[in-house]
Curated annotation (Swiss-Prot):
Organism of provenance: Listeria welshimeri serovar 6b (strain ATCC 35897 / DSM 20650 / CCUG 15529 / CIP 8149 / NCTC 11857 / SLCC 5334 / V8)
Name of the protein in its database record: DNA repair protein RecO
Domain of life: Bacteria
Keywords linked to the UniProt accession: DNA damage, DNA recombination, DNA repair
Protein encoded by which gene: recO
Example GO biological process: double-strand break repair
General function of this protein: Involved in DNA repair and RecF pathway recombination.
Listed GO CC annotations: bacterial nucleoid
PANTHER family in the record: DNA REPAIR PROTEIN RECO
Family in the record: Belongs to the RecO family.
One Pfam family, short name: RecO_N
Amino acid sequence: MEKCEGIVIRQTSYRESDKIVRMYTREFGKIGVVARGAKKTKSRLAAVTQLFTNGYFTFFGGNGLGTLQQGEVIENFSSIQQDIFMTAYATYVCELLDKATEERQPNPYLYELTFQILRDIDEGYDPQILTQIYEMKMLPVLGLYPTMDKCAICGETTGHFDFSTRSNGIICHRCFEKDRYRMHLPENVVKLLRLFFIFQLDRLGNIDVKQETKDWLQKAIDTYYDENSGLYLKSRKFLRDMDKWENMLKKDSDD
């Protein structure tokens, strides 16, 4: 019998009343368990196996699917559960984590990062910025290490910088002519990309960013992921459509 602290990142129906639950845990990394009877509303496993739930879990099992015996909810992130926009961002965070990691490879830092991101989304901090921070933090997990602290070509740390997927990082104005396909980004966007990649989440504080800046950030991050990660995430397309819808609603309310 194993015990762990984990976050439910995916659930699927299994047979008439069971679920297969994918969790990312502090102790074991990503694991899968069968939760028998969890689809029944009166089941003792119903609440603890809801998507995004953070809890303590006890299960039997080895390298394959385990069997969940019991669970205790630590945090169910109720605000996320009740808000369609928050849900979309949290779903993307969990799918990215699922696709970027292998079974049973513990990474306590990644567990804590995911928990902090979900908690901050639930508490009402900007979900788009939090998700962008998470995307930048996940790059090393995917084996991607863009050069963000100096020019990726010449190594200079001063000057004007653009972002280059071809050169795998930022490049200074001295090297612009070496990559005509580079992304010309506003200076504050380059600084934020660097901050998101290098600084710890708890040191960033509450960042107030204009929508135009967030759009630039998203363009740069999406381009880098598309050209380097090899991932296709269904939740990302849905999330981008949601972003457009949310921006339209905000614009209408401001008029």
